[in-house]
Amino acid sequence: MEYFYTSQCPDMDHLRSLSVANRWLETDLPLGDDAKDVAALSEPELEFYRFLFAFLSAADDLVNVNLGSLSELFTQKDILHYYIEQECIEVVHSRVYSAIQLMLFRGDAAARERYVRAALRDEAIRRKVEWLDSRVAECASVAEKYLLMILIEGIFFASSFASISYLRTHNLFVVTCQSNDFISRDEAIHTSASCCIYNNYLGDAPRPDEARIHQLFAEAVEIECEFLRARAPRDSLLLDLPAIISYVRYSADRLLQAIGASPLFGAPAPAADFPMALMVAEKHTNFFERRSTNYTGTVVNDL
């Protein structure tokens, strides 16, 4: 062990620096301004967004139970420092999700608790958790565990983030959409970090072959798309389900390319009017390098 800092992983140090430059707090965003918009949602739409935020708020705990702390595998301080930054921003995400949940239940904390406990037993969420359970159990190497982390961070949140962003197209929940931009931006860094570690810092750990990689990606994308189809409100004008599903598949192909695998889905890039302000890791990086300070201003479309 070295008892002083030396740079060993400049790419991971760059990702840590991006995280530091874009720190934010739950107090930066006045979510109370969005409370008036709850009444603008139909009951099926309100149910859908309550469900999404129940999943997102619980996702970190569900993941950690299965994959544990991958940071314990490393001694390089750049990687350890990066993970400290990631843990700090995940605390902010958790607090923001809690505040949004409470807003969607009009301040009724008991109703929120009952709902979340029931939602976590829903088949759409259980399918994600059970898939992760089974794939962790059969992991042949730490590299495959990192593949699962890439899929969780890069695919299993994708339809939720996109669905939340559609509220912006109706001028609803402006601050919630801004927090969604920040959180999806943060998760893009987390996904990039997992890809970076997978590519560069797992030593001699055997990598899955491309057939196995494609199998895991195909399963994760199918589960994510079915998650959306199962819970999205019928006949709602808020969402464009085909566009979100195409976005999930496009995101999967970009991640495959990021780890040196061939694309699987051939989905086109999202249209210019797709409401996600930030969509892929490269765009996120460009956004971060500009260091946004407009926490309460207009969200920049960086497509």
UniProtKB/Swiss-Prot annotation:
Domain of life: Viruses
Chain residues that bind Fe cation 2: E90, E153, E187, H190
Binding-site positions, Fe cation 1: D60, E90, H93
Catalytic reaction(s) noted: a 2'-deoxyribonucleoside 5'-diphosphate + [thioredoxin]-disulfide + H2O = a ribonucleoside 5'-diphosphate + [thioredoxin]-dithiol
Record family assignment: Belongs to the ribonucleoside diphosphate reductase small chain family.
Job of this protein: Ribonucleoside-diphosphate reductase holoenzyme provides the precursors necessary for viral DNA synthesis. Allows virus growth in non-dividing cells, as well as reactivation from latency in infected hosts. Catalyzes the biosynthesis of deoxyribonucleotides from the corresponding ribonucleotides.
Protein name: Ribonucleoside-diphosphate reductase small subunit
Species of the source: Suid herpesvirus 1 (strain Kaplan)
Source organism phylogeny: Viruses, Duplodnaviria, Heunggongvirae, Peploviricota, Herviviricetes
Gene for this chain: RIR2
